[in-house]
Design a protein with these regions (language model features):
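PP2C/PPM-type serine/threonine phosphatase catalytic domain
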Residues: 1-269
Length: 269
C-alpha cells in the first residue's frame, strides 16, 4: 500500500491550488497463480515530467508469464515517456490528454512488436492512466480496466470498456445483467499489444474540492457493482476503502487479480 504526504500542485492560471493524495494496492486474488496486474501511484516530486500526480492500472494477458511482461512494459513505458517531458511544459486545454494518447500509442507499438515474436506471441495488457496537472486530470485508456469519479456522492465511470460485451450493451443487444454472465465477457477489443493502431480514449476534466478518482482492474468491477463500489469508497479513509474493495472482490470468489488506485482531491481557490 502506498501512503504518501499530500502535495499541492502548481498554480493554475486562475490561482487555484489542488491537493492530491494517492493510494494503491494490488492483490493476486484467490484463483490465479500469478499477479499480472500492475499499478502506479505517484505524486509531487516523485511524479514524472510535468505531472503533479500519476495513477496507472494495467492488467496483463497472454498466458504463462507473458501478461506480466506486457503490464510491466506498459507502466514502465508510460512513466519513462512522461519523465522525458520538461517539468515546466505547458499545453493548451486538451493538449495534455492528446500527449498522453500519443504516449499510449508509442508504448503500444513497443508491446505490439514484442507480441508478434515467438517469445511473447499474443501478449497484451489493458492500460488506464490519470495524470493530474494543476487543477485538471487527463485520462487515457485502452481495455476494460476503469477510471471512476466520485463527486458529491455520485459515482460515474469516466472510461468506456473496450470489450465485446460493453459494445453489445451499448448497441442494445445485451442487458447489463446478461453481459455480466456472458461467455464472451472477457473478450477485449482494444488493448496494448493486440492492435497495431489502437483507438485510445482520452479526456480532460476539471477537478473539484472533495473529488475522488478511482482506477481499478476488472478483478474488482467484474465482481462488485458500481453501487457497492460507491458505498465502500464512502465508508472510510482511502486506505481502508482499498482494503475493503479488495476483500469484497475476494469474498465474491476472487477469480482474478484485483488492483485499486485511489486519488483524493482537495481544491483551494
Amino acid at each position: 500500500m502506498r501512503i504518501k504526504i499530500p502535495f499541492f500542485g502548481r498554480k493554475s492560471i486562475n490561482g487555484a491550488n489542488v491537493q492530491v493524495q494517492v493510494y494503491s494496492a494490488t492483490d493476486i486474488g484467490l484463483r490465479r497463480a500469478n499477479n499480472e496486474d500492475r499499478c502506479v501511484s505517484l505524486e509531487g516530486k516523485d511524479s514524472p515530467g510535468f505531472a503533479d500526480a500519476v495513477m496507472i492500472v494495467a492488467d496483463g494477458m497472454g498466458g504463462q508469464a507473458h501478461g506480466e511482461v506486457a503490464s510491466d512494459m506498459a507502466v514502465e513505458g508510460i512513466i519513462r515517456r512522461l519523465a522525458d517531458q520538461p517539468k515546466d511544459k505547458t499545453l493548451p486545454t486538451g493538449g495534455y490528454a492528446e500527449l498522453l494518447g500519443q504516449v499510449f500509442r508509442e508504448v503500444n507499438a513497443e508491446i505490439y512488436l514484442e507480441s508478434q515474436g515467438d517469445t511473447y506471441r499474443g501478449m497484451g495488457t489493458t492500460a488506464t492512466a490519470a495524470v493530474v496537472t494543476g487543477t485538471r486530470v487527463h485520462i487515457a485508456h485502452l481495455g476494460d480496466s476503469r477510471a471512476y469519479l466520485l463527486r458529491d456522492g455520485e459515482l460515474s465511470q469516466l472510461t468506456r470498456d473496450h470489450s465485446w460485451v460493453a459494445e453489445n450493451v451499448e448497441a442494445g443487444n445485451l442487458t447489463l445483467e446478461q453481459a455480466r454472465v456472458h461467455p464472451n465477457r472477457n473478450v477485449i477489443t482494444q488493448a496494448m499489444g493486440i492492435n497495431a493502431e489502437p483507438a485510445v480514449q482520452t479526456k480532460t476534466l476539471d477537478l473539484r474540492d472533495g473529488d475522488l478518482l478511482l482506477l481499478c482492474s476488472d478483478g474488482l468491477h467484474g465482481l462488485a457493482g458500481d453501487d457497492e463500489i460507491k458505498e465502500l469508497l464512502q465508508s472510510g479513509k482511502p486506505e481502508q476503502a482499498i482494503k475493503d474493495l479488495i476483500q469484497r472482490a475476494k469474498d465474491r470468489g476472487g477469480n482474478d487479480n484485483i488492483t485499486v488506485v485511489i486519488g483524493t482531491v482537495r481544491r483551494q481557490g
